[in-house]
């Protein structure tokens, strides 16, 4: 009798541990609880924040969602490079179900560099020039942030047939994030000014609306308080974590990525649900 009670206690404890680990015990079988995006491939694009420099982005997303995540960011590059034929060709030849774009970490968003397509926009009222679309048949040669973002979206969406062929007939979903706040060198630098962060945010939202692209407003949703974060300085330190949600005032740390991926997973589930 004593051995039977002991065995029961062990089984109960094992069952509790299994549930805590995301495992469901059913009569006669052991079944792991499915994660929300199993079998899905997610392409993480943009700059160093989505590159192999910070593998915990990919690892966190895979652990939480059950997906396969591929880091495809170009370290140190601007939105203009992301719009280039070189980078877009690389992206458009990757099999994926979702592409998540976090672009603009190396664009400061200062006045006169962002642009707008709408003469009635907030950006135009702030003095940003009204610009034209770029020519998709040529390599990217725009001069403003908004032209680069728009070029990326139109180029990607225009290659749906190629992407479907890579993806077994399914059209991948493009999710474009508004850029995160950052601070570099000093509070007075262009990188550190909230009005410049907001200018980039407005440009990305304008392009998403213009092109029918799903927008994830990480800038607003995450609500990171930069007053609590360190100031980024060169050279990049990829080892020491000096902040709350940022390693260095530019690159999110594991806690920041935990917040970011929560919103990304939620957005992918929304886009993946039956319409």
Model region roles, listed by residue range:
Residues 1-55, 62-68, 94, 271-275:
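N-terminal secretory targeting modules
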Residues 38-45, 49-147:
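Conserved SGNH/GDSL esterase-like catalytic core that processes O-acyl groups on lipids
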Residues 100-106, 178-180, 220:
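Short loop/turn segments at strand-loop or loop-helix junctions that form parts
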Residues 110-143, 168-171, 180-199, 223-225:
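Serine-dependent acyl-ester chemistry module
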Residues 146-160, 201:
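Generic structural signal for well-ordered alpha-helices
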Residues 180-275:
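Catalytic His-Asp segment of secreted/periplasmic serine-dependent ester chemistry enzymes
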